[in-house]
Regions:
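Zn2+-dependent metallopeptidase catalytic core
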Residues: 2-19
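Long, well-structured alpha-helical subdomains associated
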Residues: 99-120
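Catalytic Zn2+-binding segment of zinc metalloproteases
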Residues: 54-55, 69-87, 97-100
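Solvent-exposed alpha-helix faces
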Residues: 93-94
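Active-site scaffold of zinc-dependent metalloenzymes
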Residues: 17-59, 69-76
Length: 120
């Protein structure tokens, strides 16, 4: 499978939101949020992988990034369960709204309701 590396300003915004630009760890953390290549997070390395063949709008890409980054930030394990997915979605909504990405947050909310309505 051919992969394409995406660059998004969102991932560095997240590092800034977590640490603040003046924190020396920001420079160390930036590479951890590198988008290496549809959407899974390698929690041990801190990488988010997105299939380069999947066509995503900017808001969809932000949604996937926020969801997968949430898995990393919440320290979810490889063998995730429905509760992990639900908490990653909820955390992604918070991250996106906090950064002013309202359209992307709405995508997560819509997907969240669709995905989790049976459990709510």
């Amino acid at each position: 499978m051919k992969t394409k590396t995406y660059f998004s300003e969102f991932r560095s915004d997240i590092a800034v939101a977590i640490l603040g630009k003046d924190d020396y760890r920001y420079e160390v953390m930036k590479p951890l949020f590198q988008i290496c290549g549809f959407g899974f997070a390698e929690t041990s390395s801190g990488c988010v992988f997105i299939d380069g063949e999947v066509k995503l709008t900017k808001d969809e890409l932000r949604w996937v990034e926020a969801h997968e980054l949430a898995h990393i930030m919440l320290k979810h394990k490889k063998d995730r369960n429905d509760n992990d997915e639900m908490s990653a979605d909820m955390f992604a909504i918070i991250l996106l709204k906090d950064k002013g990405y309202d359209k992307a947050a709405q995508l997560v909310e819509d997907k969240f309701l669709e995905r989790h309505k049976r459990k709510l």
